[in-house]
Every structure is written in structure tokens, then in C-alpha cells.
Amino acid sequence: MTKNNESFTHRNFAAVLQKYKYDLNLGDIVAGTIFSFELNGVLVDIGTPVSAYLPIQEVSSNQELNNFNSLNINDTREFFLLDYNVESRQLILSIRRLEYIRAWKRIRQLLAEDSLLDVRIKGFNKGGMIVNLEGISGFVPNSHLNNFSKNTSSTNKFIKLKLLNVEEKSNNLILSHRRALIAQASSNLIVGNIIEGVINQITPYGLFIKAGNLKGLVHISEINVKQVERIPSQFKIGDTIKAVIIHVDKKQGRLSLSMKHLK
């Protein structure tokens, strides 16, 4: 394959196809049949006098499938019309780009439905967890992992997540384990209910409580007035306390608690 002429425009492309009275545009989705394997790609019949070529790097967004093993002679499927190579006079096709478009469409649907997801873990870095959703790389920040243990033995396993932030234009996909845990326990997380948990962090603005897989915050304003100035002496990490649920933030996966409202 030769490098595409960068000066080639959509108008030039239209002119090439108008010569054959064929109505196609870059970005179109076309049906085609694979009829020949080349060294670095396959030839595809899409019904045009101009030949169509699928480079190996455009076979799939999945690195494990980005080879010829998933393709066969006479396979008929849809392709994304990616480019036109002036020098080789070939239409350049892509399955990878088509998968990308459909993946984001599916993700937008999952976001609208606020779905609880089973997502494959791809690895970890200092900031959190790297996952794969619909072939798109996503990220779970440490602040939304709750108590999930970050270790290599978890790689390729599945974790329950919910979407947190989706920005298709910047290819930014942020998910939350914390939101998923709140959703799974939602039937028991009723405002006014009393829960019991263990203090796992003491800060100037309150107490962080671990109750099972969930984390909650007793803000300093929700601790008994007499105890506010003596938090370090009144509480220590590992203490078991009871608190009342005063707010469940399902969008951020946060649990707000109060000790002032205990009867």
C-alpha cells in the first residue's frame, strides 16, 4: 500500500465516483464481499468499478482480532468507507472504524438507561483501573473503586460498574464501581435507616465509614455538637459506630450519614 495523497479531498473523491455514476461518500457504510487476500490486507467487492481494500490494521479495534483469522473468502458484511488511495486507485475500507461508531452508539444507550455493567478489567495504573467496554478503553479512578483490591490477578476478570462520564469527542470514558455498589444495595439504602460500619478514615471534615462494600461520610456537621471539637479523642480508626442514612447520591455513588439523628 502506498501512502494516501494528503491533498485528495472529498470533492476529488466524488468526482472519481461520478465518473462511474456511483453514489458514495467518505464515511458511508457499505456492504461488500471479500474475494482475495493480499499480504497486508484483503480485496473487497462493494459493487463499484473502483476496487476496495481493507488494510489489516483496520480489521478490528480488538488487538486480539486485528488479523486475518476472523476473515474468510466470500464473507459478506458491512464496512466503513474510510479513504481513497489516489496512487493505487483503491477505496480504503475499515471494520475497526465501524466497530468504533457502533460501540459509542451502544455506550450512549447504556448511559441513557443507567445500566449496571459487567466490564472486563484490562489493568491498573497509579490513578485507577483500566477497563474495556464495547471495545472502547475506559477508566475507573481510585476514588470510585471503593475497596476493590488493585492486583494483577484481577486482570481479564469482570467487575460491576456504572458509567460516570462519557465524552465521545475526546474518547473519554469514565466508570464507577462505587456507583455500581450503591445501585446493587439500593433496596436497603433508605433514608432514615440505621446502618453500622467501621471508621476507616478520620478527616477535619468528618468520618469515613465502611459498611460492607459501601463507604459513607458522617460530615462534621452531622456529629453530635459536643463531640465536634474532640473528634480525635472521641473516635479512632477501627471503631464500630451506628449512623442514620440522610442522603443517597446515586449519580456519584455517595452515602451521607448522620450521628445527630440517632434516636
From Swiss-Prot:
Molecular functions per Gene Ontology: mRNA binding; structural constituent of ribosome
CDD domains membership: S1_RPS1_repeat_ec1_hs1 (cd05687), S1_RPS1_repeat_ec2_hs2 (cd04465)
GO biological process, one term: translation
Localization terms from the record: Plastid, Chloroplast
GO cellular component terms listed in the entry, alphabetical order: chloroplast; ribonucleoprotein complex; ribosome
Keywords: Chloroplast, Plastid, Repeat, Ribonucleoprotein, Ribosomal protein
Domain S1 motif: 27-96, 114-178, 192-260
UniProt family annotation: Belongs to the bacterial ribosomal protein bS1 family.
Name of protein: Small ribosomal subunit protein bS1c
Organism: Porphyra purpurea (Red seaweed)
